A protein has these predicted regions:
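Conserved alpha-helical substructure of the radical SAM core
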Residues: 1-151
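Short coil/loop residues immediately preceding or within conserved phosphate-binding loops
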Residues: 4, 288-289
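Flexible mid-to-C-terminal extensions adjoining Fe-S/redox cofactors in radical SAM and related proteins
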Residues: 1, 23, 299-300, 304-354
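Residue-level signal for mature regions of secreted extracellular proteins and peptides
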Residues: 6, 10-13, 278, 296, ...
Length: 354
């Protein structure tokens, strides 16, 4: 059985994160179509099954058939986790919607005319209200709707994980490479918890944001989040280009450990440390055995830490890199563990929090 499958279904993303391993953005258009997704799931189910799948991107909420993908995973009895930045494309109003909106506004404020408001002033009021609605409608992105969140709950989604890197809006905009999206994200986080979903957050400590952790913990406590994962910055993809402005110095890392120790006592949920930051290899690495990643272009890799790693080096380590577009049936699931996490071997990680 495949224990852990991470499936990047799209490279398109509303953000332009400084550390993004997938080099995702709105100018990227590679996508896994629904039929290929189903065929891949069917293949793994035929050779032993899938215990857990993590659906990610890019931003998976920009995939037109995301909800169908989640439904298909749950039909097959797979524990399904969704990774997101909490942003989706805004559903624009049609001309009919706008006409209905204006009609409703006129009905709602008709008493103003009856109470003596001048006709011209009334028309100016309706115009202003319409313009306010249309200004909001002109936005490209939006938060998840209450309907979205309840649909995810009804589909049986097991967990949703938010990429949440800062509480200060300027810091958030800098590290996420976006503008005016912070409020969408926080609103989405509140909505998913209100819908009863299990919700976690991921935080990558960098020069830009490592001092933000206490404020993030406070917000997650208010939102009643279940878990916060502290992840190591991996210099791959866009992160490799920005390594000098992201990678913590030894002094900064030691300061972050002190911040982490305080936050560990304050967070109401579970505070988890990613494998590369664990001092002792308590987690037995299964990368390339019964743990796999499928990129947005169909390439199959052993672990998310290697999405931009040199393919020849991986092959030299005995790790095959097939592609679901061309040779899906060549993918084999093995069992076993590595003596040391593969990410620590290849990236020479030697810092630890625990």
């Amino acid at each position: 059985m495949l224990k852990d499958l991470c499936f990047e279904i799209i490279q398109t993303c509303p953000n332009h994160c400084l550390f993004c391993s997938s080099v995702a953005g709105m100018d990227k258009h590679q996508i896994i179509d629904y039929d290929l997704f189903k065929r891949t799931i069917d293949y793994f189910m035929s050779i032993g099954g899938i215990e857990e799948i993590s659906i990610s991107g890019g931003e998976p909420f920009l995939h037109p058939r995301l909800f169908e993908m989640i439904r298909y995973c749950k039909i097959n009895g797979i524990k399904t986790v969704l990774f997101t930045s909490g942003i989706k494309m805004r559903n624009k109003m049609t001309d009919d919607d706008k006409q209905q909106l204006e009609f409703n506004l006129r009905q709602q404020y008709s008493s103003y005319l009856n109470e003596g408001m001048p006709k011209e002033e009334y028309e100016n009021l309706i115009t202003k209200l319409m313009n306010d609605y249309l200004k909001y409608d002109a936005r490209t992105f939006d938060s998840l709707s209450t309907y979205d969140c309840h649909l995810l709950k009804n589909l049986g989604l097991d967990k949703i994980i938010f990429d949440f890197q800062a509480w200060n809006k300027d810091t958030y905009n800098q590290i996420m490479g976006s503008k005016d999206s912070f409020d969408f994200v926080t609103l989405s986080m509140i909505k998913v918890k209100s819908a009863g979903l299990v919700a976690d957050a991921h935080f990558i400590s960098t020069k830009v944001n490592y001092k933000e952790l206490p404020d993030i913990v406070e917000m997650l406590n208010v939102a009643n989040f279940d878990q916060l994962s502290i992840l190591n910055f991996v210099p791959q993809g866009r992160g490799k280009d920005n390594e000098s402005i992201l990678s913590l110095s030894e002094e900064e890392f030691q300061e972050f450990i002190q911040i982490y120790d305080k936050c560990k006592e304050q967070f109401h949920g579970n505070l988890r440390i990613g494998i590369p930051l664990q001092g002792i290899d308590t987690h037995k690495c299964t990368a390339g055995f019964d743990k796999l990643v499928i990129k947005y272009d169909g390439t199959v890799l052993p672990c998310p830490a290697f999405k931009e790693y040199d393919i020849k080096k991986l092959n030299a380590l005995g790790i095959k890199t097939p592609n679901i577009h061309y040779n899906l049936e060549d993918i084999k699931v093995h069992h076993g563990t590595r003596k040391q996490p593969l990410c620590k071997q290849l990236y020479k990680f030697n810092k630890s929090i625990q």
